[in-house]
Amino acid sequence: IPIEFAPQIPYHGVEDLRFTPGWGDSTSNEYWTYSFLWYLDGKPETSSEIIEKNLQLYYTGLIGRNIEKRKIPADRILTPKTSFKEVKASAGDVKTFGGTIYMLDYIEQKPITLNCVIHLKNCAASENKTFIFYEISPKPLTDGIWQQLDNLNTSFNCSKSD
């Protein structure tokens, strides 16, 4: 970080992505299901508004880098819309956010809504670092896939990240 396709996001650090095996298979229950971690320098302010803005920039850039490669017609391109709110903090979180990302599924070239849970974490062993863990899937939050995503979050040990 900065992220190549979204340099306007004003953070410095490392991004780590984890894709489910069926992430890119539209017939799979795991389609578009993945998680990523931002291991950031400093303690940037984090609010639902900041998350909305950053993810709007992130997915605009992600889609933009796929337009030419996937030959997406101009009439199918739509601006991503994000909506987030702070929810009850999950165990081990400083803050937890929930929301949605409405965007172009550039694989199938049609609109998709991704549900998202975001975990903001601090770590005593990493005094001037911030961890933001994103869980993402188009499946409803009641689907079993979310347990798999949350297992990544609950098994995360920030003291091993330094």
Residue ranges of each PLM-predicted region?
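Short, well-structured beta-strand
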Residues: 90-162
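Conserved polar/disulfide-associated segments of primarily extracytoplasmic proteins
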Residues: 22-106
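A structural "domain/chain start" motif
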Residues: 11-27
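Short glycine/proline-enriched turns and hinge-like loops at secondary-structure junctions
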Residues: 12, 30, 110-112
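Generic structural hydrophobic/aromatic packing signal, biased to beta-strands
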Residues: 1, 19, 58, 116-118, ...
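Proline-anchored loop/turn motifs at beta-strand termini and strand-loop-strand connectors
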Residues: 1-15
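Hydrophobic side chains in beta-strands
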Residues: 7, 21, 38-40, 134-135
